[in-house]
Regions:
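Protein maturation boundaries and topogenic segments
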Residues: 1-81, 149-153, 157-172
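Short beta-strand-centered aromatic/proline hotspots
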Residues: 82-87
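Short, solvent-exposed secondary-structure boundary/capping segments
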Residues: 94-98
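Short strand-turn-strand beta-turns centered on an Asx-Gly dipeptide
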Residues: 102-104
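Acidic loop->beta-strand submotif enriched in PP2C/PPM serine/threonine phosphatases
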Residues: 113-129
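Phosphate/adenylate-binding glycine loop and adjacent helical scaffold
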Residues: 134
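Active-site loop architecture of trypsin-fold serine endopeptidases
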Residues: 138-145
Length: 172
Protein backbone atom coordinates (compact mmCIF):
# COMPACT_ATOMS: atom_id res chain seq x y z
CA UNK A 1 0.00 0.00 0.00
CA UNK A 2 1.43 3.36 -0.96
CA UNK A 3 0.59 6.94 -0.18
CA UNK A 4 -1.03 7.25 -3.60
CA UNK A 5 -3.61 4.69 -2.47
CA UNK A 6 -4.84 7.13 0.22
CA UNK A 7 -4.62 10.16 -2.07
CA UNK A 8 -6.80 8.46 -4.68
CA UNK A 9 -9.49 7.40 -2.17
CA UNK A 10 -12.86 9.00 -2.42
CA UNK A 11 -13.66 11.54 0.32
CA UNK A 12 -16.35 9.40 1.96
CA UNK A 13 -13.97 6.46 2.37
CA UNK A 14 -11.29 8.78 3.81
CA UNK A 15 -13.79 10.12 6.32
CA UNK A 16 -14.89 6.63 7.40
CA UNK A 17 -11.28 5.49 7.64
CA UNK A 18 -10.39 8.50 9.80
CA UNK A 19 -13.27 7.66 12.20
CA UNK A 20 -12.12 4.05 12.41
CA UNK A 21 -8.56 5.17 13.20
CA UNK A 22 -9.83 7.57 15.91
CA UNK A 23 -11.97 4.84 17.49
CA UNK A 24 -9.03 2.41 17.51
CA UNK A 25 -6.77 5.03 19.13
CA UNK A 26 -9.38 5.87 21.80
CA UNK A 27 -9.90 2.18 22.59
CA UNK A 28 -6.14 1.61 22.88
CA UNK A 29 -5.75 4.61 25.19
CA UNK A 30 -8.71 3.50 27.32
CA UNK A 31 -7.48 -0.08 27.57
CA UNK A 32 -3.80 0.57 28.22
CA UNK A 33 -3.30 4.12 29.51
CA UNK A 34 -6.16 6.07 31.16
CA UNK A 35 -9.87 5.70 31.83
CA UNK A 36 -12.42 7.76 33.76
CA UNK A 37 -13.53 6.28 37.08
CA UNK A 38 -16.26 7.37 39.49
CA UNK A 39 -15.85 7.58 43.27
CA UNK A 40 -18.55 5.48 44.92
CA UNK A 41 -19.09 6.26 48.60
CA UNK A 42 -17.56 8.37 51.34
CA UNK A 43 -14.53 6.27 52.32
CA UNK A 44 -12.06 8.81 50.84
CA UNK A 45 -13.71 11.97 52.26
CA UNK A 46 -12.42 14.72 52.59
CA UNK A 47 -9.85 14.14 49.85
CA UNK A 48 -12.34 12.69 47.35
CA UNK A 49 -16.09 13.09 47.37
CA UNK A 50 -18.82 10.62 46.45
CA UNK A 51 -19.55 10.85 42.69
CA UNK A 52 -16.26 12.62 41.82
CA UNK A 53 -15.12 11.51 38.37
CA UNK A 54 -11.39 10.93 38.15
CA UNK A 55 -8.75 9.78 35.71
CA UNK A 56 -7.30 6.32 36.39
CA UNK A 57 -3.66 6.18 35.28
CA UNK A 58 -3.07 2.57 34.23
CA UNK A 59 0.47 2.99 32.91
CA UNK A 60 2.58 4.69 35.64
CA UNK A 61 3.11 1.54 37.71
CA UNK A 62 4.68 -0.18 34.70
CA UNK A 63 7.57 2.30 35.04
CA UNK A 64 7.63 3.19 38.75
CA UNK A 65 6.94 1.54 42.09
CA UNK A 66 3.79 1.98 44.12
CA UNK A 67 4.54 4.57 46.82
CA UNK A 68 3.22 5.22 50.29
CA UNK A 69 0.24 7.60 50.22
CA UNK A 70 -0.55 7.00 46.51
CA UNK A 71 -4.28 6.88 45.84
CA UNK A 72 -4.95 3.64 43.96
CA UNK A 73 -7.85 1.88 42.28
CA UNK A 74 -8.23 -1.76 43.27
CA UNK A 75 -10.34 -4.54 41.83
CA UNK A 76 -11.47 -6.73 44.72
CA UNK A 77 -14.15 -9.40 44.24
CA UNK A 78 -15.76 -7.73 41.19
CA UNK A 79 -15.81 -4.39 43.02
CA UNK A 80 -13.66 -1.33 42.37
CA UNK A 81 -12.25 0.43 45.43
CA UNK A 82 -10.35 3.70 45.70
CA UNK A 83 -7.96 3.72 48.66
CA UNK A 84 -4.68 5.17 49.86
CA UNK A 85 -1.54 3.01 50.11
CA UNK A 86 -0.20 3.06 53.67
CA UNK A 87 1.93 -0.08 54.04
CA UNK A 88 4.50 -1.38 51.55
CA UNK A 89 6.02 -4.87 51.23
CA UNK A 90 8.36 -5.70 54.12
CA UNK A 91 6.78 -3.21 56.54
CA UNK A 92 4.69 -3.47 59.69
CA UNK A 93 1.70 -1.15 60.16
CA UNK A 94 0.16 0.05 63.40
CA UNK A 95 -2.33 2.76 64.38
CA UNK A 96 -2.01 3.78 68.01
CA UNK A 97 -3.61 6.83 69.64
CA UNK A 98 -4.72 8.03 66.19
CA UNK A 99 -1.14 7.99 64.86
CA UNK A 100 0.35 5.88 62.08
CA UNK A 101 3.46 3.82 62.82
CA UNK A 102 5.43 2.09 60.08
CA UNK A 103 8.09 -0.30 61.42
CA UNK A 104 7.50 1.26 64.88
CA UNK A 105 8.26 4.81 63.64
CA UNK A 106 5.62 7.55 63.62
CA UNK A 107 4.72 8.67 60.08
CA UNK A 108 2.74 11.91 59.68
CA UNK A 109 -0.48 11.81 57.67
CA UNK A 110 -1.73 15.16 56.40
CA UNK A 111 -4.89 13.89 54.70
CA UNK A 112 -6.59 11.92 57.51
CA UNK A 113 -9.03 14.11 59.43
CA UNK A 114 -10.99 11.33 61.08
CA UNK A 115 -10.08 9.38 64.17
CA UNK A 116 -8.55 5.99 63.41
CA UNK A 117 -9.24 3.17 65.87
CA UNK A 118 -6.14 1.39 67.18
CA UNK A 119 -5.01 -1.36 64.81
CA UNK A 120 -1.94 -3.61 64.63
CA UNK A 121 -0.95 -5.68 61.60
CA UNK A 122 0.68 -8.62 63.38
CA UNK A 123 3.17 -9.62 60.67
CA UNK A 124 5.24 -7.93 57.99
CA UNK A 125 3.54 -7.23 54.69
CA UNK A 126 4.76 -9.91 52.23
CA UNK A 127 6.32 -9.10 48.85
CA UNK A 128 3.69 -8.27 46.25
CA UNK A 129 1.11 -7.04 48.80
CA UNK A 130 0.03 -3.64 50.13
CA UNK A 131 -1.92 -2.27 53.08
CA UNK A 132 -4.52 0.30 51.97
CA UNK A 133 -7.02 2.45 53.86
CA UNK A 134 -9.61 5.09 53.10
CA UNK A 135 -9.06 8.63 54.33
CA UNK A 136 -12.43 8.53 56.10
CA UNK A 137 -11.39 5.69 58.40
CA UNK A 138 -14.65 5.18 60.37
CA UNK A 139 -16.60 4.23 57.20
CA UNK A 140 -13.86 2.72 55.04
CA UNK A 141 -13.89 -0.96 54.09
CA UNK A 142 -10.14 -1.38 53.65
CA UNK A 143 -7.17 -3.61 54.51
CA UNK A 144 -8.13 -3.56 58.19
CA UNK A 145 -11.18 -5.65 57.21
CA UNK A 146 -10.60 -7.12 53.74
CA UNK A 147 -6.92 -7.93 54.18
CA UNK A 148 -3.82 -7.04 52.23
CA UNK A 149 -4.13 -6.15 48.56
CA UNK A 150 -2.22 -8.08 45.89
CA UNK A 151 -0.15 -5.93 43.56
CA UNK A 152 -1.93 -7.43 40.53
CA UNK A 153 -5.28 -6.23 41.95
CA UNK A 154 -4.07 -2.61 41.83
CA UNK A 155 -5.25 -1.31 38.46
CA UNK A 156 -3.42 2.00 38.68
CA UNK A 157 -3.24 5.27 40.52
CA UNK A 158 -5.57 8.22 40.54
CA UNK A 159 -5.57 11.69 42.00
CA UNK A 160 -6.97 13.95 39.29
CA UNK A 161 -10.66 14.93 39.50
CA UNK A 162 -12.22 15.91 36.17
CA UNK A 163 -15.83 16.37 37.36
CA UNK A 164 -17.54 18.21 38.99
CA UNK A 165 -15.72 21.19 37.57
CA UNK A 166 -15.62 23.04 40.91
CA UNK A 167 -13.37 20.19 42.20
CA UNK A 168 -11.26 19.94 39.02
CA UNK A 169 -7.60 19.27 39.72
CA UNK A 170 -5.07 17.13 41.51
CA UNK A 171 -6.17 15.74 44.90
CA UNK A 172 -3.34 14.16 46.84
Amino acid sequence: MTLSFFVNMNDKVKEILSYVIIIVIVLLIKHFIVIPIKVNGDSMNNTLKDKDIMILDKISYRFQDIKRFDIVVIKKDKEYLIKRVIGLPGETVEYKNNKLYINNKNVAEKFNHEETPDFILEEKIPEGYYFVVGDNRPVSNDSRYIGLIKEEDILGKTSFVIFPFNRFGNKK
